[in-house]
Regions:
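Juxtamembrane membrane-water interface segments that cap and precede transmembrane helices
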Residues: 81-87, 222-238, 370-375, 409-423
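Alpha-helical transmembrane segments of multi-pass inner-membrane proteins
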Residues: 131-138, 180-310, 337, 525-527
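Transmembrane alpha-helices of multi-pass inner-membrane enzymes
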Residues: 251, 296-305, 464-528
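Loop-to-helix entry and N-terminal half of a specific, functionally important transmembrane alpha helix
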Residues: 270-281, 445-480
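Long extracytoplasmic/lumenal interhelical loops at the membrane interface
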Residues: 349-352, 356-428, 447-454
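A membrane-periplasm/extracellular boundary helix in multi-pass inner-membrane enzymes
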Residues: 192, 197-204, 287, 292, ...
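Hydrophobic, aromatic-rich transmembrane alpha-helices
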Residues: 49-63, 100-113, 251-263, 431-454
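N-terminal hydrophobic segments of proteins, predominantly signal-anchor/transmembrane helices
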Residues: 58-88, 94-157
């Protein structure tokens, strides 16, 4: 008997059935596609193609959760672009949640096979307390529907497991380089498109007839109070200018941290990293967002001082870090000069808007009001609601409540303030705010302890910018508004980057591309 001709029971019966089913599927797909083409329904045709692509991605993600994570991040960043051109389709909106669920399932299967490392976050107890209280708030009697609670749980906690994914993501230094290379490529693409849109106006990268829900978000112009110049606030690949501006802050921090890492590790890639930082800096300036400009400028000062403090204690290392900071400042200045030479009107109009609304000498300065008075007033407004001790329920004042009310026909709550801390009080009462502050402090403090352990190592610049991003998002950003934390891009990157931060002390440094006389890692210690 020859093994090559051996057949198995049922094989001869199943193959014709599978072939017949495949033929039927192909014929049905061809029929539907031809219908869409004849009817001119290109949107439906695009959805069919997108669905098929997602199916292929799911199979690949189940086989390799690390590649699946990169697919998820790419979808996360470019999902809004599809939403804009498909009439704000809610099926597209939930695509990222489906993909991250596939990542979780694949990751869980790998953990069951003992293929990955799992760690216990030192802030796990404060985090679980806040999660427990959030689950209880789903059943708050003041909430008009449990669907608001489901929305709140998703916005607050759905991406928290990414911390474990981030911790297990890297096995070698090459994995780290790959992760940040991919993310910087996506960031420079988004920044470049946003800069082009700032110059060309809202007709670029936006549909001719956007959906009613997102029309105003994609066509927002601001007027300088003195000169009267009009500037457009670009959205790039996102549906709103605020999401683009907040992503630019994150992208700038990542680019600055990776640049510091390359300074201590390798001469390769420094020039490219500087060019990426220049493009992102131009995106920040052209975003038209005063918050993005101020937070990026402040972060540059803080990170520069931190890099000097965390430089390796070797002869000449502090000088090299100082030169790197000077190079970064020169790159930022070069980006401004290039934009000025190429598109002077686009730059000067935004400079006029920034100076007329932020300069303390300007009669129309809003700096003190927007930084101190307005957020504080909105926070105190939360205590004018009679249920401030108990709240109305998680999700009742969150991002996206209008979709729950409209699509699911749920009675609107009509509550909320712009302050993020105030929104937490409205949703979960004063106890919820206290638990949020405890959790936030625990997360940031744990991150700071890791950063101190990284002092003197090549990982320090990356570690510090992750710590700084976590601090900004959990404290000042959320105090001003709940939207930054509930922004799915910032939320997903927060927990993913925190997991990466906790992995850095145990990540081995490869001998490849090491600068002669470069810094050595401190003694390896495992996180428990």
């Amino acid at each position: 008997m020859r093994l090559g001709t051996q057949t198995f029971p049922g094989h001869s019966r199943r193959s014709p059935l599978l072939a017949f089913a495949l033929v039927l599927f192909v014929l049905f797909a061809a029929w539907k596609i031809s219908e869409y083409i004849v009817a001119g329904q290109t949107g439906n045709l695009f959805l069919v193609g997108l669905g098929f692509a997602v199916l292929v991605l799911v199979v690949a993600m189940l086989n390799n959760w690390r590649n699946g994570l990169y697919f998820f991040l790419a979808w996360l960043l470019f999902e809004d672009l599809a939403r804009k051109y498909l009439g704000n389709n809610m099926a597209i909106y939930f695509g990222k949640d489906f993909l991250v669920t596939v990542v979780y399932l694949s990751f869980f299967a790998a953990s069951r096979r003992k293929e990955i490392q799992i760690f216990r976050p030192p802030f796990l107890i404060p985090l679980l307390l806040f999660v427990w209280f959030g689950v209880i708030q789903v059943f708050n009697p003041a909430s008009s529907s449990l669907l608001y609670g489901v929305l709140g749980l998703k916005l607050y906690f759905y991406y928290v497991p990414l911390i474990f994914v981030g911790y297990a993501l890297f096995e070698t230094e090459g994995d780290l380089r790959r992760f940040f290379s991919i993310n910087l490529f996506l960031a420079v693409l988004i920044a470049g498109l946003g800069s082009a849109q700032a110059i060309l106006g809202h007709t670029f990268l936006n549909p001719e007839h956007p959906a009613e829900d997102i029309r105003e978000l994609s066509q927002l112009y601001r007027v300088a109070p003195i000169s009267g110049v009009i500037i457009y606030r670009p959205t790039s690949v996102f549906v709103s200018d605020g999401r683009f501006a907040s992503y630019m802050i994150l992208a700038w921090l990542i680019a600055f941290g990776v640049g510091g890492y390359l300074l201590l590790r390798s001469r390769r890639g420094r020039l490219l990293a500087s060019l990426i930082l220049a493009v992102i800096s131009a995106g920040v300036i052209l975003s038209g967002s005063r918050g993005a400009v101020l937070w990026t400028a402040g972060s540059a000062l803080v990170c520069a001082a931190a890099f000097l403090w965390g430089a390796p204690r070797r002869q000449g290392e502090a000088l090299r870090v100082m030169r790197s900071i000077q190079r970064s400042l020169l790159v930022g200045g070069l980006a401004i000069i290039i934009v000025f030479l190429a598109y002077p009107e686009a730059l000067l109009s935004r400079v006029a808007f920034y100076s007329e609304t932020l300069s303390l000498d300007s009669p129309h300065s809003e700096l003190v009001y927007r930084v101190r008075d307005y957020p504080l007033q909105n926070f105190l407004m939360a205590f004018t609601y009679d249920r401030w001790p108990y709240g109305f329920g998680i999700g009742t004042a969150s991002l996206g409540v209008q979709y729950v009310s409209r699509i699911m026909h749920v009675p609107p709550m009509n509550i909320g303030v712009e302050s993020g801390y105030g929104s937490i009080v409205i949703e979960m009462g004063i106890v919820g705010l206290a638990l949020w502050l405890i959790m936030s402090f625990a997360v940031v403090f744990a991150c700071w302890r890791i950063v101190r352990r990284l002092k003197g190592s090549p990982w320090f610049p990356i570690g510090f910018v992750i710590f700084w991003f976590a601090f900004l998002l959990l404290f000042p950003f959320t105090f001003n508004g709940l939207q930054p934390y509930q922004n799915f891009v910032l939320n997903a990157y927060l927990w993913l980057l925190v997991g990466i931060l906790f992995r850095l002390p145990t990540l081995e440094i490869s001998a490849q591309n090491t600068i002669a006389g470069g810094a050595a890692m401190p003694r390896r210690r495992w996180i428990r």
